[in-house]
């Protein structure tokens, strides 16, 4: 897929999951960095909704430690059915219910199979490119 994407010169997608886009300093710093350092290399997808079950499984395969810190009840959540109301629900509600860590956003580079929760981790990823 990445060879095909390269041939088409399409940007790859980085998703940023956050419960509070406007007031989250870590989220805003990641956004500012991506806007100023990546030009047209990426499509940035901002999400204030809980990831799908498939996305949770994919992210868990990438880095279970980071994901477990972001989603406190990860083991329980991964056993839910894909149609459970949690998936796709507002992250602000998930914070209230204890299903999402309010301290940091979560970014995911789907193509490079990388994820993190802070500015430093995304800087390190982009420096490798």
From Swiss-Prot:
UniProt keyword list: Mitochondrion, Oxidoreductase, Transit peptide
Localization, UniProt: Mitochondrion
Pfam family, one: DUF1687
Cellular component terms per the entry's GO annotation: mitochondrion
Gene3D superfamilies registered for this protein in UniProt: Glutaredoxin
Active-site residue list: 94
Top-level enzyme category: oxidoreductase
Transit peptide as recorded in UniProt: 1-21
PANTHER family named among the record's database cross-references: REDOX PROTEIN FMP46, MITOCHONDRIAL-RELATED
The protein's name: Putative redox protein FMP46, mitochondrial
């Amino acid at each position: 897929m990445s060879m095909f994407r390269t041939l088409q010169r399409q940007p790859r997608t980085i998703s940023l999951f956050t419960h509070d886009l406007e007031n989250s300093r870590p989220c805003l710093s990641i956004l500012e960095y991506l806007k100023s350092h990546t030009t047209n290399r990426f499509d940035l997808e901002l999400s204030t909704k809980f990831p799908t079950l498939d996305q949770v499984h994919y992210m868990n395969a990438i880095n279970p430690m980071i994901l477990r810190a972001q989603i406190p009840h990860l083991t329980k959540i991964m056993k839910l059915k894909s149609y459970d109301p949690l998936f796709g629900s507002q992250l602000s509600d998930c914070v209230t219910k204890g299903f999402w860590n309010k301290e940091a956003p979560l970014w995911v580079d789907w193509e490079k199979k990388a994820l993190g929760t802070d500015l430093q981790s995304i800087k390190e990823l982009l420096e490798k490119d």
